[in-house]
Amino acid sequence: MGSIAKEEQPSTKVEKPTFSSKANTLEFAQSLDAKDHMRRFRDQYIIPSKANIKTKKLAKPGLSDEPSIYFCGNSLGLQPKCVQEYLQAHLDTWSSIAVHGHFRDLEDSPLTQWQLLAEHAAKQCAPIVGAKASEVAIMGTLTTNLHLLMASFYTPTPEKSKIIMEWKAFPSDHYAIESQIRGHGYNPEEAMVMIAPDEGSYEISTEKILRTIDEHASTTALLLLPGIQYYTGQLFDIKTITAYAQSKGLTVGWDLAHAAGNVPLQLHDWNVDFAVWCTYKYMNAGPGSIAGAYVHERHGEVDYSEGEEKPKYRHRLMGWYGGDQSCRFLMNNKFRPSPGASGYQVSNPSVVDLTSLCAALSIFNQTSMAEISQKTLHLTAYLEHLLLSTNSSDSPAFRIITPSDPSARGTQLSVLLKPGRLETLSDMLEEAGIVADKRKPDVIRVAPVPLYNTYEDVWNFVQIFNKALEKCEEA
């Protein structure tokens, strides 16, 4: 089935960086940037200018050269400059050779033939999620893929029908789980087991998750959690939770929307059954771009022991694009799935989407998740240090609800404001040329992305953020 696209294994113990008394100066931030080996990547992205992020017309390059501070990659990543080149190559292919683009490689194009483009993107994506290329399929959108994989992996019985999930999951995940349960004839109020945060905390501890598994294992069919919780930014211990749940007889799936491209993953080595993710956040493939799916190789096997006409394989919702390429165009209505995750594909994927994704992933091919995570470690720790150094312990203006432990988070810090401050503060930040993400109730999610953000960005953000807080206090 091929080899695992390995990244360096992350250490289980991550030491948080410490900073000197001079850390709260512009000169210190600039000195960190000067030593940053990843600063070479910033120029490969288009950073919106402060003027352009406020305009109500198509962006004009001449409006301003002063870049905005863009800390919203956890919602939508910035556009890589190479995307335009790749898209133009696709348009030129379509206009010049039309249908022949499906099967013909062009010598001067950065793209492979359309029929192989999804497979190529899967190979690019595999190292990012720690999987074999055959275990990755690039297809659909995140919630669509979640439905497709739950159709295969959620197999409830009257004795075991529950799904263990997080309390206040991202709404689309909640809807998908609820509808799958209803579709099988069960009551969501009884079958949805929601794990709430620990008392007095916004975090859900691994211990509480394991206790919940113990409590409900005999009646549970599936454990489905996010790799990183979208509101708090908490990174779950995927390896430990997966192994424990499987030891109790549960199938385990993960929504990696906020984890893929953000933190090191080893889905194959961790024995995860299935996972889904989007590519428009940390992978920077564009709004609504095509998504990814992972299926462990043991679930993608096709057994021909009873002959070529009687393949045995795991049940899934079938479509022609999941058929083996050797017989996909025979049109004989005899489904022979492609081995691996590609056998779970349904429809012909959008080449425009694949083109944008392949362009974005070409930058990841120049680095590694190990290198990315090292900068994330330092960049987010610096942001945390500056924020906390000016937040009064007697009467704090905000609270960081993301875990302080760097092994339990990625790039995002979720800043919980006092009630009623969110809209006013967000407007002030936007007016100052800062793009961050607000999430009701009362949270600003700040995500400095290591591929294109700098330590100077972090320093400038904190100065503006503190001034905006002071104005809110005075109002």
From Swiss-Prot:
Residues given in the record as pyridoxal 5'-phosphate binding sites: L142, T143, F170, P171, S172, D173, D255, H258, Y280, W320, N348
Subcellular location(s) per record: Cytoplasm
Residues recorded as bearing N6-(pyridoxal phosphate)lysine in the entry: K281
Top enzyme class: hydrolase
A cellular-component GO term for this protein: cytoplasm
Main subcellular localisation: cytoplasm
Molecular function terms, GO-annotated: kynureninase activity; pyridoxal phosphate binding
E.C. code: 3.7.1.3
Subunit field text: Homodimer.
Family: Belongs to the kynureninase family.
Biological function: Catalyzes the cleavage of L-kynurenine (L-Kyn) and L-3-hydroxykynurenine (L-3OHKyn) into anthranilic acid (AA) and 3-hydroxyanthranilic acid (3-OHAA), respectively.
Family annotation (HAMAP family): Kynureninase
Protein name as annotated: Kynureninase
Lineage per the UniProt record: Eukaryota, Fungi, Dikarya, Ascomycota, Pezizomycotina
